Amino acid sequence: MNKARKTYVLKLYVAGNTPNSVRALKTLKNILEQEFQGIYALKVIDVLKNPQLAEEDKILATPTLSKILPPPVRKIIGDLSDRERVLIGLDLLYEELTEEDWEAQSSL
């Protein structure tokens, strides 16, 4: 995987400016800046202000993180503080490991 060729589109659904929402956003931004700097788009959706968006996307709990692109769509509900859990849940860690394995094998 060449990260430079992919753009990751993510949506974070939160319920207002609660401590859980603030923590989820801060943690997610840290992960994205460390791992995907410059190649991601993050839209934060407050389900209290935009309940129709939550309904359209079938969001039942917050915080919910949804990876829209690249396919397939993946969702993580709840605590986002575990970096590895977030990356695995969104199929992003698997892509990193696959690329590292491929590069290691091709350099032999």
UniProtKB/Swiss-Prot annotation:
Protein encoded by which gene: kaiB
Signal sequence range: none
Species whose genome carries this gene: Trichormus variabilis (strain ATCC 29413 / PCC 7937) (Anabaena variabilis)
Domain of life: Bacteria
Family according to the record: Belongs to the KaiB family.
Record's keyword annotation contains RNA-binding: no
Disulfide bond annotation, renumbered to this chain: none
Quaternary assembly: The KaiABC complex composition changes during the circadian cycle to control KaiC phosphorylation. Complexes KaiC(6), KaiA(2-4):KaiC(6), KaiB(6):KaiC(6) and KaiC(6):KaiB(6):KaiA(12) are among the most important forms, many form cooperatively. Undergoes a major conformational rearrangment; in the free state forms homotetramers as a dimer of dimers. When bound to the CI domain of KaiC switches to a monomeric thioredoxin-fold (KaiB(fs)). KaiB(fs) binds CikA, leading it to dephosphorylate phospho-RpaA.
Record protein name field: Circadian clock oscillator protein KaiB
Pfam family membership, one: KaiB
GO BP terms: circadian rhythm
Biological classification of the source: Bacteria, Bacillati, Cyanobacteriota, Cyanophyceae, Nostocales
Domain comment as written in the entry: Has 2 forms, fold switches to a thioredoxin-like fold (KaiB(fs)) when bound to KaiC.
Function comment: Key component of the KaiABC oscillator complex, which constitutes the main circadian regulator in cyanobacteria. Complex composition changes during the circadian cycle to control KaiC phosphorylation. KaiA stimulates KaiC autophosphorylation, while KaiB sequesters KaiA, leading to KaiC autodephosphorylation. Phospho-Ser-431 KaiC accumulation triggers binding of KaiB to form the KaiB(6):KaiC(6) complex, leading to changes in output regulators CikA and SasA. KaiB switches to a thioredoxin-like fold (KaiB(fs)) when bound to KaiC. A metamorphic protein which reversibly switches between an inactive tetrameric fold and a rare, thioredoxin-like monomeric fold (KaiB(fs)). KaiB(fs) binds phospho-KaiC, KaiA and CikA. KaiA and CikA compete for binding to KaiB(fs), and KaiB(fs) and SasA compete for binding to KaiC, thus the clock oscillator and output signal pathway are tightly coupled.
Keywords (A to Z) from UniProt: Biological rhythms
